[in-house]
Amino acid sequence: MRISIFGLGYVGAVCAGCLSARGHEVIGVDVSSTKIDLINQGKSPIVEPGLEALLQQGRQTGRLSGTTDFKKAVLDSDVSFICVGTPSKKNGDLDLGYIETVCREIGFAIREKSERHTVVVRSTVLPGTVNNVVIPLIEDCSGKKAGVDFGVGTNPEFLRESTAIKDYDFPPMTVIGELDKQTGDLLEEIYRELDAPIIRKTVEVAEMIKYTCNVWHAAKVTFANEIGNIAKAVGVDGREVMDVICQDHKLNLSRYYMRPGFAFGGSCLPKDVRALTYRASQLDVEHPMLGSLMRSNSNQVQKAFDLITSHDTRKVGLLGLSFKAGTDDLRESPLVELAEMLIGKGYELRIFDRNVEYARVHGANKEYIESKIPHVSSLLVSDLDEVVASSDVLVLGNGDELFVDLVNKTPSGKKLVDLVGFMPHTTTAQAEGICW
């Protein structure tokens, strides 16, 4: 395939070398004549192990060339990868100046092409950038319609400096954000030889995936550092601790807890977070990330409250009271906190939880329920249908399978607030998720 790559920094230069090595005809484009001269000499414009050999191979086979002529690069290629930098502004926002310049140049060139051209943003950009910046600029400069006259997609990269060639050849996944199916098919064809799952999503989802990956990596480093600092302060080798943590692929390094939704609770997590952060404070060990966990958790409860109270009704049915399905444990359940907030604001609340209802009559938690939360337990109703019938807003609080049917067949006139993730799709006119 004929590919033009705009921007020959770390991402663009690596892509140029790897794509040409896989048989594609690649044109590297940059405003820097120095970089272009290096590319045309088969030399690398950056320090990256193994890259220069690929660039030399590309030049020797005639599959790689460099130019400062933006227009010619577009006219002589079928697809353009935008790999320019998106540096930070002083306020932390992205500087899209390079993106905007390239989009204008590509747009003007597309205006003169009769055949379809595809534009793929590989630069890291915030969700909404392609739809709100890239597409309008190219459409305005080309006089053509995105998704119809020219293709548009995103293809976030997961390359690490110093291991970029290996990361390109053996990626964890290939993410394609497509405005139109033809663009997705084209990108899938380019990457079909790579041994990695190809994931096709909307443009906005692909944009968000890249940021989520990078922020998650930063969060992991910060978490490990704070744990290491506390561990050292109590006389423990933090490396030894984290080595064991990383051996658990069932819970610690898995998708189990990595699902957006409601706050955490129960008898362990809140208590242990408080205990560890209290000890860290006693030892004068700074722990800004760990110290923010409980505050963030409370914010999620407040978010649920705001979502529920945004509806113009006072009749609310809370489905689930324990912190998770399959238990009657109400200790530090965020749903109890949510119920208390609704009661405090005068909402007409009905609660259904079959496990808690049983415990209120028979279980070991009977005394806890009666002594600690009598104002909440008094609102428990044993009949799910009664709660549904008497409520205007139904809140799915935990993952009890009894509640699934309400998502599939929400009663007429009822509003649904999903804190669990039962909804197969995002927010609709009748149902809304806390994070979807």
UniProtKB/Swiss-Prot annotation:
<dbReference type="Pfam" id="PF00984">
    <property type="entry name" value="UDPG_MGDP_dh"/>
</dbReference>
<dbReference type="InterPro" id="IPR008927">
    <property type="entry name" value="6-PGluconate_DH-like_C_sf"/>
</dbReference>
<feature type="binding site" description="in chain A">
    <location>
        <position position="210"/>
    </location>
    <ligand>
        <name>GDP-alpha-D-mannuronate</name>
    </ligand>
</feature>
<feature type="binding site" description="in chain B">
    <location>
        <position position="324"/>
    </location>
    <ligand>
        <name>GDP-alpha-D-mannuronate</name>
    </ligand>
</feature>
<feature type="binding site" description="in chain A">
    <location>
        <position position="124"/>
    </location>
    <ligand>
        <name>NAD(+)</name>
    </ligand>
</feature>
<dbReference type="GO" id="GO:0042121">
    <property type="term" value="P:alginic acid biosynthetic process"/>
</dbReference>
<dbReference type="InterPro" id="IPR014027">
    <property type="entry name" value="UDP-Glc/GDP-Man_DH_C"/>
</dbReference>
<dbReference type="GO" id="GO:0036460">
    <property type="term" value="P:cellular response to cell envelope stress"/>
</dbReference>
<comment type="subunit">
    <text>Forms a domain-swapped dimer with each peptide contributing to each active site. The dimers assemble further. X-ray structures indicate this enzyme exists as a homotetramer PubMed:12705829, but kinetic and physical results obtained in PubMed:2470755 and PubMed:12135385 indicate that it is probably a homohexamer.</text>
</comment>
<keyword id="KW-0016">Alginate biosynthesis</keyword>
<comment type="function">
    <text>Catalyzes the oxidation of guanosine diphospho-D-mannose (GDP-D-mannose) to GDP-D-mannuronic acid, a precursor for alginate polymerization. The alginate layer causes a mucoid phenotype and provides a protective barrier against host immune defenses and antibiotics. Other sugars are not used as substrates.</text>
</comment>
<feature type="binding site" description="in chain B">
    <location>
        <position position="259"/>
    </location>
    <ligand>
        <name>GDP-alpha-D-mannuronate</name>
    </ligand>
</feature>
<feature type="binding site" description="in chain A">
    <location>
        <position position="86"/>
    </location>
    <ligand>
        <name>NAD(+)</name>
    </ligand>
</feature>
<feature type="binding site" description="in chain A">
    <location>
        <position position="225"/>
    </location>
    <ligand>
        <name>GDP-alpha-D-mannuronate</name>
    </ligand>
</feature>
<feature type="region of interest" description="Inter-domain linker">
    <location>
        <begin position="278"/>
        <end position="295"/>
    </location>
</feature>
<dbReference type="GO" id="GO:0044010">
    <property type="term" value="P:single-species biofilm formation"/>
</dbReference>
<keyword id="KW-0520">NAD</keyword>
<feature type="binding site" description="in chain A">
    <location>
        <position position="217"/>
    </location>
    <ligand>
        <name>GDP-alpha-D-mannuronate</name>
    </ligand>
</feature>
<keyword id="KW-0560">Oxidoreductase</keyword>
<feature type="binding site" description="in chain B">
    <location>
        <position position="265"/>
    </location>
    <ligand>
        <name>GDP-alpha-D-mannuronate</name>
    </ligand>
</feature>
<feature type="binding site" description="in chain A">
    <location>
        <position position="214"/>
    </location>
    <ligand>
        <name>GDP-alpha-D-mannuronate</name>
    </ligand>
</feature>
<dbReference type="InterPro" id="IPR017476">
    <property type="entry name" value="UDP-Glc/GDP-Man"/>
</dbReference>
<feature type="binding site" description="in chain B">
    <location>
        <position position="331"/>
    </location>
    <ligand>
        <name>NAD(+)</name>
    </ligand>
</feature>
<dbReference type="InterPro" id="IPR036220">
    <property type="entry name" value="UDP-Glc/GDP-Man_DH_C_sf"/>
</dbReference>
<protein>
    <recommendedName>
        <fullName>GDP-mannose 6-dehydrogenase</fullName>
        <ecNumber>1.1.1.132</ecNumber>
    </recommendedName>
</protein>
<dbReference type="Pfam" id="PF03720">
    <property type="entry name" value="UDPG_MGDP_dh_C"/>
</dbReference>
<feature type="binding site" description="in chain A">
    <location>
        <position position="11"/>
    </location>
    <ligand>
        <name>NAD(+)</name>
    </ligand>
</feature>
<dbReference type="InterPro" id="IPR028358">
    <property type="entry name" value="GDPman_DH"/>
</dbReference>
<comment type="pathway">
    <text>Glycan biosynthesis; alginate biosynthesis.</text>
</comment>
<feature type="binding site" description="in chain B">
    <location>
        <position position="257"/>
    </location>
    <ligand>
        <name>GDP-alpha-D-mannuronate</name>
    </ligand>
</feature>
<feature type="binding site" description="in chain A">
    <location>
        <position position="35"/>
    </location>
    <ligand>
        <name>NAD(+)</name>
    </ligand>
</feature>
<feature type="binding site" description="in chain A">
    <location>
        <position position="10"/>
    </location>
    <ligand>
        <name>NAD(+)</name>
    </ligand>
</feature>
<dbReference type="GO" id="GO:0006970">
    <property type="term" value="P:response to osmotic stress"/>
</dbReference>
<feature type="binding site" description="in chain A">
    <location>
        <position position="30"/>
    </location>
    <ligand>
        <name>NAD(+)</name>
    </ligand>
</feature>
<dbReference type="InterPro" id="IPR036291">
    <property type="entry name" value="NAD(P)-bd_dom_sf"/>
</dbReference>
<feature type="binding site" description="in chain A">
    <location>
        <position position="161"/>
    </location>
    <ligand>
        <name>GDP-alpha-D-mannuronate</name>
    </ligand>
</feature>
<feature type="binding site" description="in chain B">
    <location>
        <position position="262"/>
    </location>
    <ligand>
        <name>GDP-alpha-D-mannuronate</name>
    </ligand>
</feature>
<dbReference type="GO" id="GO:0051287">
    <property type="term" value="F:NAD binding"/>
</dbReference>
<dbReference type="GO" id="GO:0047919">
    <property type="term" value="F:GDP-mannose 6-dehydrogenase activity"/>
</dbReference>
<dbReference type="Pfam" id="PF03721">
    <property type="entry name" value="UDPG_MGDP_dh_N"/>
</dbReference>
<dbReference type="InterPro" id="IPR001732">
    <property type="entry name" value="UDP-Glc/GDP-Man_DH_N"/>
</dbReference>
<feature type="binding site" description="in chain B">
    <location>
        <position position="271"/>
    </location>
    <ligand>
        <name>NAD(+)</name>
    </ligand>
</feature>
